[in-house]
């Protein structure tokens, strides 16, 4: 390890400082004034910005002055997790749910046997779409895959270049049915063109809607907005539909009374689609479903759907409690609580996983994602702040050896980090091997090695203060974003087969992986660049863009990055939903949804460094609290 050298600064610098020993254990914190002292990493000056008051520094027992992020501690302690209780795991609730599933299936099937009263050839298409949309938004669609396909096949058989009407015998097409059909069919991989929406414009090129904002009219525009969010690259009409419908709905919210409809509109405008995690949507939709005119007019009794949705939500809640208890035991057993230099967000990561994958059989995915993200966070804080460049180079080499004996050359605190990476990656590979029927360790190790290399590059930029070109930073940043390593092993533990040709369409070199990694890097940087800069991490998408384009402002850079994000989202939509793909949507959905989960975490701010109100609310609404039956 190279010695720490000191140089003079022009004025005294007061730093909130903690003492930390070699194992990473925090000693008594205190404030001291360090006169005229700054640190060099590997002979490179760390600027005053890197020693700002947003960062705590610490002197370890080997006299190394370490940078340390000022992060709050774990919010969900062991006692709290153990105090959670649920009786919804009892067999009687599962039996009750199974009876309701059978009744709802009968309701689905009754659509095919039209009685001329509750459903007719004049409304059979919209009824089918409403049914599919309802079970999906309530989070119970996994029970009705066969019925959903049958319903959508029927709707698609009547789809035309001008859209559809409410029923197969409708004389004219209908914007509400067409918008809901476009969205629902596209989400299931049917080949439907957005150009169909052009047929609902007037001579001025505007979407034809009456000025009078009736409930039916508002719902039509709401479905138009929801459809516009499932846009593919180059679809101008979808951009126009989104702009028009968003403005219309915001205006409507100012005029209509507070109601289930206004809450539904507010939720959809707030989350859109890419950050509206399925379990969160189910939790919110349960609160409003069955309270509006549209649902009460439906041929299907909403009470059955609502009761089933609540039961399924709470039955999964009981499983979440058991999985959380296991996760906390793993976290403690791994030695993570002693790693005081890093963030501990394993409960938040588990919450994100359970919001995108709440099928009971995907326990391995949820726990694997939480573990992988915890490791990523530990490594992030070690490479970005706590470790010295010499130490990080040793750690990077040790990871590539993949042998516990490689820890002999590491500082004490790094030995614990190494072993949690080594043990957890090996354990997750064993689970993946069982699911996939082949060895996966070497393939997954390669992904982790590339990830560590990308971190090492960033550590060198931090040490030197270098701001690379945007392209260089962006390509490295997509790897260091961690999307690939957070997704790879968890998806391999599912019951979905991933032969080599399928894996290539989800992992590298797929466009899906590239775009999912891109959105995490781009959105993460827009939320973190100021705090990172205060810690001495100068390189970001924003700073690199400004360097490449002299004279541009931060606002210019942010506008450019946000435009890139919009394009990336459309590209992701296409990679997931493109028709006639050789890889089914089900094989790509988990990796895609992981990008949605990370995007949610950065929706308002950096929700990983600081557990925001929104993050805490997500944990409470989707994991901690059951719904009232």
UniProtKB/Swiss-Prot annotation:
Pathway: Terpene metabolism; oleoresin biosynthesis; Secondary metabolite biosynthesis; terpenoid biosynthesis. InterPro entries: Isoprenoid_synthase_dom_sf, Terpene_cyclase-like_1_C, Terpene_cyclase_plant_C1, Terpene_synth_N, Terpene_synth_N_sf, Terpene_synthase-like, Terpene_synthase_metal-bd, Terpenoid_cyclase/PrenylTrfase. Mg(2+) 1 binds at residues 380, 384. It catalyses: (2E)-geranyl diphosphate = (1S,5S)-alpha-pinene + diphosphate; (2E)-geranyl diphosphate = (1S,5S)-beta-pinene + diphosphate. The Asp-Asp-Xaa-Xaa-Asp/Glu (DDXXD/E) motif is important for the catalytic activity, presumably through binding to Mg(2+). Monoterpene synthase (TPS) involved in the biosynthesis of monoterpene natural products included in conifer oleoresin secretions and volatile emissions; these compounds contribute to biotic and abiotic stress defense against herbivores and pathogens. Catalyzes the conversion of (2E)-geranyl diphosphate (GPP) to (-)-alpha-pinene and, to a lower extent, to (-)-beta-pinene. This is (-)-alpha pinene synthase 1, chloroplastic. The lineage of its organism: Eukaryota, Viridiplantae, Streptophyta, Embryophyta, Tracheophyta. The gene is TPS-(-)Apin1.
């Amino acid at each position: 390890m190279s010695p720490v050298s000191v140089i003079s600064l022009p004025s005294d610098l007061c730093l909130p400082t903690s003492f930390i020993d070699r194992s990473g254990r925090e000693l008594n914190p205190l404030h001291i004034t360090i006169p005229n002292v700054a640190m060099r990493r590997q002979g490179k000056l760390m600027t005053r910005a890197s020693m700002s008051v947003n960062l705590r520094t610490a002197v370890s027992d080997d006299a190394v002055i370490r940078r340390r992020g000022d992060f709050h501690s774990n919010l969900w302690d062991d006692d709290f997790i153990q105090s959670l209780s649920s009786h919804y795991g009892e067999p009687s609730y599962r039996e009750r749910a199974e009876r309701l599933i059978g009744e709802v299936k009968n309701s689905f099937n009754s659509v095919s046997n039209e009685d001329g009263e509750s459903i007719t050839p004049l409304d059979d298409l919209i009824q089918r779409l409403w049914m599919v949309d309802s079970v999906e938004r309530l989070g119970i669609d996994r029970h009705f895959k066969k019925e959903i396909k049958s319903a959508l096949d029927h709707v698609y058989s009547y789809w035309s270049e001008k859209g559809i009407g409410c029923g197969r015998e409708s004389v004219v097409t209908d914007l509400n049915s067409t918008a809901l059909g476009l969205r629902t069919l596209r989400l299931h991989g049917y080949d439907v063109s957005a150009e169909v929406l052009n047929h609902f414009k007037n001579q001025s090129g505007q979407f034809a809607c009456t000025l009078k904002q009736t409930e039916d009219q508002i719902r039509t525009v709401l479905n138009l907005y929801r459809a516009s969010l499932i846009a593919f690259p180059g679809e101008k009409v979808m951009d126009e539909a989104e702009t028009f419908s968003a403005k219309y709905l915001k205006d409507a919210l100012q005029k209509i009374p507070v109601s289930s409809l206004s809450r539904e509109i507010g939720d959809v405008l707030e989350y859109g689609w890419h950050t509206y995690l399925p379990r969160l949507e189910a939790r919110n939709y349960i609160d409003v479903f069955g309270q509006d005119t549209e649902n009460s007019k439906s041929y299907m009794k909403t009470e059955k759907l609502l009761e089933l949705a609540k039961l399924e939500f709470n039955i999964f809640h009981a499983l979440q409690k058991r999985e959380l208890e296991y996760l906390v035991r793993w976290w403690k057993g791994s030695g993570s609580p002693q790693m005081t230099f890093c963030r501990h967000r394993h409960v938040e990561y588990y919450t994100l996983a359970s919001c995108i994958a709440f099928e009971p059989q995907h326990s391995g995915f949820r726990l694997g994602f939480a573990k992988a993200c915890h490791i990523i966070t530990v490594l992030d804080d070690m490479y970005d702040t706590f470790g010295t460049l010499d130490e990080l180079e040793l750690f990077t080499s040790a990871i590539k050896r993949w042998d516990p004996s490689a820890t002999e050359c590491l500082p004490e605190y790094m030995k614990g980090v190494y072993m949690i990476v080594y043990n957890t990656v090996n354990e997750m590979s064993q689970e993946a091997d069982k699911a996939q029927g082949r060895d996966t360790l070497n393939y997954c190790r390669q992904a982790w090695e590339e990830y560590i290399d990308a971190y090492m590059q960033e550590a060198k930029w931090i040490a030197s203060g270098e701001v690379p070109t945007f392209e260089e930073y962006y390509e490295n940043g997509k790897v260091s974003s961690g999307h690939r390593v957070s997704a790879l092993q968890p998806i391999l533990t599912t019951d979905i087969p991933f032969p080599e040709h399928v894996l290539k369409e989800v992992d590298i070199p797929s466009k899906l992986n590239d775009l999912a990694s891109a959105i995490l890097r781009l959105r993460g940087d827009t939320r973190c660049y100021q705090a990172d800069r205060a810690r001495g991490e100068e390189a970001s998408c924003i700073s690199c863009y400004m360097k490449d384009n002299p004279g541009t402002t931060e606002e210019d850079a942010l506008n450019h990055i946000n435009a890139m994000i919009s394009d990336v989202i459309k590209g992701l939509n296409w990679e997931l939903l493109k028709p006639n793909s050789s890889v089914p949507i089900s094989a790509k959905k988990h990796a895609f949804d992981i990008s949605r989960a990370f995007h949610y975490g950065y929706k308002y701010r950096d929700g990983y460094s600081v557990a925001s109100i929104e993050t805490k609310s997500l944990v409470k609404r989707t994991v901690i609290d059951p719904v009232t039956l």
